[in-house]
């Protein structure tokens, strides 16, 4: 009996130690974030057509002109600074009056963020119609919450779904880049069967995975042939097809 107790005690101690080490390892991994480009963020903050506010849950981009009544909850890619997306997303706010809510994922990992959609939509209570979207793994998380009642559409930014939405009535736009070395055009097409048949697929020439934000080069990515300004203009042009011109 004493021997069994000793074995159980040792086993529990080992399990607790391993769990602690894994937890510390996860925290360390998540703490290494791809920081947003300062100049790009400053440009976004200085845009007179867009008002930017920060809450505990998100960063909210609202038009200073007439709002369209539509909103996009945007989920960042894994370990990417949410502020890295400001410059690229202000384009569609400026052009259409769209409201954009960029989430601040738990531990900078969207897959660990299980907060409901209303945690973020509450930061923009005047929006009447919601679309969800995200970059890379953030897009995969957006797919998971796209079935919520208030959601009418989904935008995938260099991403693809892991869950089946093929029978949904969602309006879906999938934006990829010819130079994306992570969510390659082939990977995006291989996941097409999980999306509605009416999904619109677009591929921006010369655009890579990191072009969806402004956070520098990303390991494993392809080369971009565009400046940040050119990438922003190209992305905005594709989003206009879904959100319309203001």
What are these regions (language model features)?
Residues 133-142:
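Gly/Ala-rich beta-loop-alpha elbow adjacent to hydrolase catalytic centers
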Residues 150-161, 171:
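A conserved short beta-strand
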Residues 168, 173-176:
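Short beta-strand/loop motif that positions the catalytic acidic residue
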Residues 69-77:
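Short beta-strand element of the alpha/beta-hydrolase
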């Amino acid at each position: 009996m004493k021997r069994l107790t000793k074995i159980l005690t040792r086993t529990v101690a080992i399990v607790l130690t391993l769990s602690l080490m894994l937890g510390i390892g996860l925290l360390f991994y998540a703490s290494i974030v791809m920081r947003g480009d300062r100049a790009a963020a400053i440009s976004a903050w200085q845009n007179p057509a867009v008002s930017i506010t920060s809450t505990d849950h998100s960063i909210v981009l609202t038009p200073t002109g007439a709002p369209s009544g539509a909103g996009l909850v945007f989920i960042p890619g894994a370990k990417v600074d949410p502020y890295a997306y400001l410059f690229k997303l202000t384009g569609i706010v400026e052009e259409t009056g769209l409201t954009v809510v960029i989430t601040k994922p738990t531990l900078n990992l969207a897959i660990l963020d299980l907060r409901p959609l209303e945690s973020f939509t509450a930061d923009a209570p005047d929006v009447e119609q919601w679309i969800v979207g995200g970059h890379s793994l953030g897009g995969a998380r957006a797919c998971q919450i796209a079935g919520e009642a208030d959601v009418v559409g989904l935008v995938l930014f260099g991403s693809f779904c892991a869950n089946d939405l093929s029978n949904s009535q969602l309006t879906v736009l999938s934006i990829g880049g010819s130079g994306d070395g992570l969510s390659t055009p082939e990977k995006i097409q291989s996941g097409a069967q999980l999306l509605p048949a009416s999904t619109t697929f677009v591929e921006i020439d010369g655009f890579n995975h990191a072009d969806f934000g402004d956070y520098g080069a990303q390991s494993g990515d392809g080369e971009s042939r565009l400046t940040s300004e050119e990438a922003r203009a190209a992305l905005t042009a594709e989003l206009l097809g879904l959100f319309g011109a203001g």
